[in-house]
Amino acid sequence: AAECADRVLIMEDLTIGYGDNVLAKGINLTLRRGEKAALLGANGTGKTTLLKTILGEVDPLKGRAKIGNRVQIGYFSQTYERLNPKQTLLENFVIEYGFTEEHTRSMLGGMLFHGDDVFKEIGTLSGGQKARLVLLKLVLDGANCLVLDEPTNHLDIMARETVEAALTAFDGTVLVVSHDRYFVNEIADRIWEIEDLEVKDYKGNYEFYQEERKKQAELLAEREAELEKQRAYAEQQTKKNAPQAVPEKVE
């Protein structure tokens, strides 16, 4: 991957969404060179919208998202859609990269394509095989920042481990949306989570993120218990200090 600016993706006071539908606001985040961040959140919280806003495919509602100097982004979904289904793997690599058959076989071997696999038409490949192919092409295209939306969907364990190994070895920057917590724990050194219209930043892997969430939940529970105690005490004091009704005298 080519060298790029230290600040790869920059978000400043960013609000994302569509029209009146705000998905997240007040986002101030910077992804630096070599960092691998995973974007988490429940369905519909705006993960893909954030990716598309960063890539300039969706306009921000407020603020801005910038891509650093000399940053070359490889977007998994786009490359996936651009594959020519009629070409064989060998044709694709010879035409697009000018590789010899020997070099093509060696590159594809690293992604678990062996023997006659090189003569398969791209359209006949399984979802997992296509995912491995796209990852290889992104790196060959010179991308130094990979943006991946659910890259391990439809992958078997072996294919997933191959993708994990490729991303771990990749010396550029990665931003990935994934529901696969094992995959996220293997590759991410930073977690961004969209929740309650905010993007929270955890500087560590998935295990670290879980620990932090647990601590936050415990703190919240403690705070709630303390507030409840204060409320009960205040109520007690109010009752104690309330003027007592004077019994009427019976003549």
Feature annotation, model-predicted:
Residues 3-251:
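ABC ATP-binding cassette signature C-motif
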